[in-house]
Design a protein with these regions (language model features):
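Polyanion-binding surfaces on beta-sheet-dominated domains and ring/shell assemblies
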Residues: 1-253
């Protein structure tokens, strides 16, 4: 890739929502993320996404010629690999790959690339959570990093996406966006939310993923979905700025 420009954007935003009478939302909670595009050479697209202590880099190679067993005659085939921060990949990473595939498949205009292959590799540099118990922070960062890398690679997409981790604290029932490792340890339930956006990131089209683990009731679910939509909307707005800052210098006036 020639003269790739690395763009870093830091966004810090908080929850200004009024407390819910049944499930109080932590109004002091803030989410801090960093994103960088075009960080790797010798691949078609790459990105780095950092959220608190969780850091993921993603590379995209494609469209390329697939192996015979991978080829799909009418659409693009996806090869998704997740590599852990420590050790070798296990069943845990295979589950992350399946969830990541479920999120990315509806976003890509696959019929534009028949008999081709796109390789998406996510390397987790820092987990930011107890890997034996949780994977929501890693999954959320992998989703966001993969989307940015696909844009950097110039792969045709149908829509945008943004993903956030959420936790419900055990004693207070506070709904925390982007929880820390310490907050996860005292959580009643944990959730990874990924939403699909259209119309320039202004309209939510679909819930791509809601991966939940733990105990929660219907009211808490609706509350976290409401808060999650608000936070994903803010995140996708900042992702658009990152993309705009990256693409603008490449345009020929």
């Amino acid at each position: 890739m020639n003269q790739l420009r690395c763009i870093k954007y830091l966004c810090i935003y908080g929850n200004n929502k009024e407390p819910n009478t049944k499930n109080r939302l932590d109004s002091a909670e803030k989410m801090s993320v960093q994103a960088e595009i075009g960080i790797l050479d010798h691949v078609d697209g790459s990105s780095e996404f950092v959220s608190q202590d969780t850091k993921v880099i993603c590379s995209v190679t494609g469209p390329i010629e697939p192996k015979a067993r991978q080829e799909q005659p009418t659409q693009l085939a996806l090869e998704i690999i997740v590599r852990p921060a420590k050790g070798v990949a296990t069943t845990r990473e295979k589950v992350l790959e399946d969830k990541l595939r479920a999120v990315l498949t509806p976003l890509i205009t696959r019929h534009c690339y028949p008999r081709q292959l796109c390789q998406i590799t996510c390397q987790i540099l820092e987990s930011g959570e107890d890997e034996a118990e949780f994977s929501l922070r890693e999954l959320s960062c992998c989703i966001n990093a993969a989307f940015l890398a696909l844009v950097d690679a110039g792969i045709a997409l149908n829509s945008m996406c943004a993903s956030i981790p959420i936790a419900i604290i055990k004693d207070t029932s506070d709904i925390i966006v982007d929880p820390t490792a310490e907050q996860l340890k005292i959580s009643l339930s944990v959730h990874t939310l990924a939403l699909e956006f259209v119309n320039g990131g202004k309209v939510v089209k679909n819930v791509l993923l809601l991966d939940s683990n733990g105990d929660f009731n219907e009211d808490q679910l609706f509350s976290l979905l409401e808060l999650g939509e608000q936070k994903c909307q803010e995140l996708v707005t900042n992702i658009r700025r990152i993309i705009q800052d990256n693409i603008s210098p490449r345009l020929v006036v």
